[in-house]
Amino acid sequence: MVAERTRKAAASGSRGPGELGAPGPGTVALAEQCARLPSPGCCGLLALALCSLALSLLAHFRTAELQARVLRLEAERGEQQMEKAILGRVNQLLDEKWKFYSRRRREAPKMSPGCNCPPGPPGPTGRPGLPGDKGAIGMPGRVGIKGQPGEKGAPGDAGMSIVGPRGPPGQPGTRGFPGFPGPIGLDGRPGHPGPKGEMGLVGPRGQPGPQGQKGEKGQCGEYPHREYPGGMLAALRSNPIMSLKLLPLLNSVRLAPPPVIKRRTFQGEQSQTGIQGPPGPPGPPGPSGPLGHPGLPGPIGPPGLPGPPGPKGDPGIQGYHGRKGERGMPGMPGKHGAKGVPGIAVAGMKGEPGTPGTKGEKGAAGSPGLLGQKGEKGDAGNAIGGGRGEPGPPGLPGPPGPKGEAGVDGQAGPPGQQGDKGQPGAAGEQGPSGPKGAKGEPGKGEMVDYNGSINEALQEIRTLALMGPPGLPGQTGPPGPPGTPGQRGEIGLPGPPGHDGDKGPRGKPGDMGPAGPQGPPGKDGPPGMKGEVGPPGSPGEKGETGQAGPQGLDGPTGEKGEPGDEGRPGATGLPGPIGLPGFTGEKGEAGEKGDPGAEVPGPPGPEGPPGPPGLQGFPGPKGEAGLEGSKGEKGSQGEKGDRGPLGLPGASGLDGRPGPPGTPGPIGVPGPAGPKGERGSKGDPGMTGPTGAAGLPGLHGPPGDKGNRGERGKKGSRGPKGDKGDQGAPGLDAPCPLGEDGLPVQGCWNK
């Protein structure tokens, strides 16, 4: 207490003895400075923002440095690699051009000094030479035209899933909540006419009709002792219109047994005037009998006995699994339940801990309120909180929902395994023979053939005799320039047709074609016999959980329970935060003026020790209401108190949510067969199934008949150059060898 007063005195400045001063400027400045300081949360956010900015700048600088290093390295390496690639390509092109344009060097034939023979005739065509070495890789060609898309390949193997292999199919779930009935569907197609029903009972006799007009005079009847059917037939034959009208009646008279016929008069239709018949013979006058009255209708017969039971039908086909029902609509709000019987006071089950609530935003500071008077101590409350009620029994299963829509087509099945490798095919046909090779080089022979011309031979001998001996062979001259390409030769005569080749092996079976168009629907067949009731189908898949229905109406408020026993006092709470200091009290009255002291200024003495605390003064007047203190921080949670006594049962709670659907009950006894239903309308055609896998290759069939002669083949490409010809026969002596033009070789003239 003393320390607090001392601190207040030091903060507010020195005051005179017995006076109350106003708050000093130091207190106000300190309060304003404390209010302006940022909160710890704001400081933390500011520090986090600065750290993020620094990390972003560091990452940016490091990325720029790394990018510059990569560009510099690419510039150094790129020049060397490009230089090597360009030089290698240039050398390759030069080698190709040099090989193409350079002439083959021909070696001079080794001849003795005394050989003066001209070249012999060309030898026979040599054999085709071996294929040359593989040339270098040519320049990449231009991008070709985009080809047509190929045929669709076989489905690939099933890919590996990242999640894992596909598990086995799950068990069918429990039955879902019944959905609301769907909208009214469109009118279906008109059904086929049903079978003809049984003949109904005889109806009651109708009212007598109005009296008809008098009919025309009929024809003269026959004698009564003649047969009735014969006369009737004669009359019908004479009048065809009457025969058409009375033919059903005549048939019923013929087919009916005699005891069943009852004499009854019918009011017939007005007949047409018949054809005048021939005059009959005069008959004896018959007795004119009185006309009888129409008889009364007979009594209604008893109803017929029920027919024997029909034959037992064939057993029905196993039913398909029911389709998954659509998601049900939210349920309607339940009716207001009646008040329940008060339960027994039993300890309720411990509730599950609730989810922690989100921290609320800081509220605005409120205006300072007036200091209220101290309230009286309240009475101890009664523990009347009821325990949690027991869950209600599960509801009855709802009616089955409407039929769901057709499901989406399933995924395509896994591809089939790869088939076995086929047998090797037969050897192919022999290819066409190549064209004739080019003319070979002149042989080393020394014999000249002049095709039997003696004059030319003698002239050549004279020319050779005048020439001198051959000189020494000169040096090999440089290769001449490449000659101009010769003209294209004439098209040769067509060769003889080749022999027919053997028939090739049978080709592999083609892929299965696409499914054909859907055919027109067939006629409806006659209705089959009714079969037995098939076994009950397996339970369908669990439907999707319906949306939760709206909350039901609040039930009536229960009667107020009796007050419970007095609860135990709770644990002492934590002390509250210290409030702000109150306003300074009013200034007291001035004291009496003291006697003037002696004005002898002495030296200031040292500060003396604090004196003993004085007596506690009288309480001052009640100050004004202080400012409302700020809301203190949330205190730590206290220890859990002891369990209170059992309270009275609470009011009846709201109806709980519907329980989970119960397990399906056992299959009931099959009921009696119901009446035969009408024939349903024909269903829509199903979707076209996927194309099946290619079938196995068929067996090797018998060899087919010999085919017709094929068309004449095209001329083949030019074959390779032939080998060098054989050495020719020895010819006449010549001083100088002759060239291709028939003249001596240059440098070997006889001057």
From Swiss-Prot:
GO terms for cellular component: cell-cell junction; collagen trimer; collagen-containing extracellular matrix; postsynaptic membrane. Residues 60-751 are extracellular. InterPro entries: Collagen, Collagen_Structural_Proteins. Residues 120-223 are annotated as: Triple-helical region 1 (COL1). Residues 274-445 are annotated as: Triple-helical region 2 (COL2). Transgenic mice overexpressing COL13A1 with a 90 amino acid in-frame deletion of the COL2 sequence show embryonic lethality due either to a lack of placental formation or to cardiovascular defects in offspring from heterozygous mating. In contrast, transgenic mice expressing an N-terminally altered COL13A1 lacking both cytosolic and transmembrane domains while retaining the collagenous ectodomain are viable and fertile, but display progressive muscular myopathy. Residues 1-24, 108-127, 190-225, 265-449, 466-751 are annotated as: Disordered. GO terms for biological process: cell differentiation; cell-cell adhesion; cell-matrix adhesion; endochondral ossification; morphogenesis of a branching structure. This is Collagen alpha-1(XIII) chain. Residues 204-213, 403-436, 615-628, 684-699 have a biased composition (Low complexity). It is a single-pass type II membrane protein. Involved in cell-matrix and cell-cell adhesion interactions that are required for normal development. May participate in the linkage between muscle fiber and basement membrane. May play a role in endochondral ossification of bone and branching morphogenesis of lung. Binds heparin. At neuromuscular junctions, may play a role in acetylcholine receptor clustering. Homotrimer; disulfide-linked. Nucleation of the type XIII collagen triple helix is likely to occur at the N-terminal region with triple helix formation proceeding from the N- to the C-terminus. Interacts with FN1, perlecan/HSPG2 and NID2. Residues 1-119 are annotated as: Nonhelical region 1 (NC1). It comes from the Eukaryota. Its main location: membrane. Residues 1-40 are cytoplasmic. Residues 734-751 are annotated as: Nonhelical region 4 (NC4). The lineage of its organism: Eukaryota, Metazoa, Chordata, Craniata, Vertebrata.
